[in-house]
UniProtKB/Swiss-Prot annotation:
It comes from Rickettsia conorii (strain ATCC VR-613 / Malish 7). This is Uncharacterized protein RC0133. It comes from the Bacteria. The lineage of its organism: Bacteria, Pseudomonadati, Pseudomonadota, Alphaproteobacteria, Rickettsiales.
Length: 98
């Protein structure tokens, strides 16, 4: 396995580790995203016949909250106890004898 393949394997293994971490330990952020999406839909419906500037402002704020939640979920700097790239990748590489 050449260096490029090893780097690609590390990236894939890091994504697997992050996904596994979120699914096994931390579903609350994903639930928060779902909640924000539902709030956005409700606000859109309830403000449909109100002033379009109010509606636009609420939707923009809600969409920004959703974006921020996704950034927080996938930002390794903000998640405690998340597997580190090198540790996880090295263990997986050794396990499969790459």
């Amino acid at each position: 396995m050449n260096l490029k393949d090893q780097e690609q394997t590390k990236i894939v293994n890091n994504l697997i580790a992050k996904t596994d971490y979120l699914l096994s330990n931390n579903l609350n952020p994903l639930e928060s995203v779902r909640s924000e999406i539902n709030k956005t839909l409700a606000l859109t419906h309830s403000t449909y016949q109100q002033d379009s500037n109010i509606k636009k402002s609420w939707i923009q704020k809600s969409v920004q909250k959703i974006k921020d939640l996704f950034i927080n979920i996938f930002s390794s700097n903000k998640t405690k106890n998340e597997p580190k790239l090198n540790l996880t990748s090295d263990k997986i590489l050794k396990k499969y004898k790459y």
